[in-house]
Amino acid sequence: MLTRQARLLRRIPPPNAVLQSGLQRRHRSTDRYSNNIHTSSTQNAPAPVYDTPIREKGMTLEAKERVRAHVRKIQSSASTAAASPAVRPQPAQHFQAAPQPMPTNMPRFESDSQVKNGLDYSFIGLSGGQIFQEMMLRHDVKQVFGYPGGAILPVFDAIYNSPHFEFVLPRHEQGAGHMAEGYARVSGKPGVVLVTSGPGATNVITPMQDALSDGVPMVVFCGQVATNLIGSDAFQEADVVGISRSCTKWNVMVKDIAELPRRINEAFKIATTGRPGPVLVDLPKDVTAAILRTPIPAKSVQPGHSPYLPSNPLNPSSQPSDPLPGDADLITEAAQMINKAKRPIIFAGNGVLSSPEGPKLLKELSDKGRIPVTTTLQGLGAFDERDEKSLHMIGMHGSAYANFAMQEADVLIALGVRFDDRVTGKVDTFAPAAKAAAAEGRGGIIHFEIQPKNINKIVEAQIPVLGDVVASLGELVPQIEAVDRSAWIGRCKATKERYPFTYTPSQEGQKLKPQEVVQELDRQAEALGKEKFVISTGVGQHQMWACQYYRWTEPRSWVSSGGLGTMGFGLPSAIGAKVAAPEKYVIDIDGDASFSMTAMELATASQYDIGVKVLLFNNEFQGMVEQWQDLFYENRYSHTRMTNPDFVKLSESMGAKGLRCTKLEDLPRMMKEFLEYDGKRPIVLECLVSSEHVYPMIPAGKALHEQLLHPLLRNGSE
């Protein structure tokens, strides 16, 4: 009598039977699929080649002999096959050539026959990866930053050795995201990122949040596990759509190959519409590996032209079409308030830089109305700081004279700003003179802004003008009257002379002062031409000194992390900026702590001959944190001191040239060597600097006029 276990074993077929049964089912399934294709393509379809019936206990003798003959044919031809190359060819690199904009972004149809009855047939027979490549071409994408992985390989295979793209492979996906940001900030075009699923996608979360905070257009494409595996905790599966929901303007998972072109178009349009920002498109592997078999709506393959698309500064002829206009009556009301003002001030932000016309209109407004100008950190370069009406940057570490002027102005003209806490200080005490003038009906706050949620979110505006800032400026400037405001300009000038940016110069035998290094860079950049320079920074004290002691004169010459304050931003963003503008000097002013977070991207610059220059401040401290510990935590330096590597040797090990400056008398010569070094190779100039505080400084919870001044100025403060 059989045991229960024996009876169960008898029910399990032998392994070869299971394999044979599976092959038979697969063969029958393939036959049905092949028959369906032939039937749909023609009425007189020939019979499938493999039409010999499969019997339950094996193939017929005729079928077996046909298989053996096929194997013999393969074996006989194997000896004559060409050997595969030992090293796959690399795409040509053209980073040192100035980018040439395409004449049009419209799709390039081979013939009218590809569109019939509103349906497009041009993508039939292409894989999802090939469709991705074609859509990038239609969106004039020339540079892609990313890192491959299993889930995104169908796309990487489609763009392999493509002559249409310059692909930059970073050492970390976060580097790819910041490179795309730097590229977008300098070029005005959205940066494109291509990464795999799981950690590849989550490593781009920080750059996406950074781009969202600062209004940078970026399109991130990430791989995903196959749709039938979603939710199964598959290898490198992550709910990146859920994770990125709060740090993108829009995100989507493409679930069918037929919707891929439409989703790509939507991504580019949303990233560049209104206030620019990041978007994410999740691409399951079975979608990018699939073949499109049916026509799709013709409109879905045509790049959408956003009416508010920022212009490309590298192509001045590219202008936004039909920008969102501001309310004409409100603009007229704003002009009337400005014309009556005795002490107006212009507060310019990143929104002014959305078009090449923005800085021009800002200058015209300031010159015509004799109005002083201050900027946000991200507005640097919108107004020439050599102009006598420039008050430089405002805020926590802005100029003392800009902060004082903001508190005294009776009309505040805010252009494309968010009024974040680093600018306003204590909100209740921000711009008191303008608020008092508003209560008396003779002044107030005018806010030009494209994003509705920023209107009256922090600071109440008496005249809120919702719309494209540059378009609104174009309507405002003709209505501004020439008014004599010499008394107000004179007061601002006197305050500027009384409270300048100040530091104690280094003495012989002492370490360099970081301010001295920035001033020397500014002096030599002025001699070479400021229009030839782009400056990026990390985050920390060095970032603030760059704002204070470098005179900003050119739009889109400043690349820095403002809203999120991302350490490690400087070097990868400089690489992206250099890719966008290879003809310019691109300099990353960085601190030792910030640089160390993404220092390996120096190897990326070496690999691709991207000639970025790193001006590195080494004080072996996390400087800004140490400053707060000094001022507010009784000098308790909790985990802010660092032991650094030899940055010169580290740079040389990654193919870059390394220099080190320790003396003030050597600084001009070494700065000159630094700037004149080969524009195709990266270089690092390490400057050993003393530990300093950044002044002025507005302590948390204090008003703009309650700023901490440099000790040399405090006796004369008001």
Curated annotation (Swiss-Prot):
GO molecular function annotation:
acetolactate synthase activity; flavin adenine dinucleotide binding; magnesium ion binding; thiamine pyrophosphate binding
Q: Subcellular location, in the record's words?
A: Mitochondrion
The UniProt keywords, alphabetically, are: Amino-acid biosynthesis, Branched-chain amino acid biosynthesis, FAD, Flavoprotein, Magnesium, Metal-binding, Mitochondrion, Thiamine pyrophosphate, Transferase, Transit peptide
Keyword Mitochondrion present in the record's keywords: the answer is: yes
What are the Low complexity biased-composition ranges?
Answer: 76-99, 306-325
Which residues participate in thiamine diphosphate binding? Answer: 173
Q: Where is this region: Thiamine pyrophosphate binding?
A: 541-621
Family assignment from sequence similarity: Belongs to the TPP enzyme family.
What is the protein's given name? Acetolactate synthase, mitochondrial
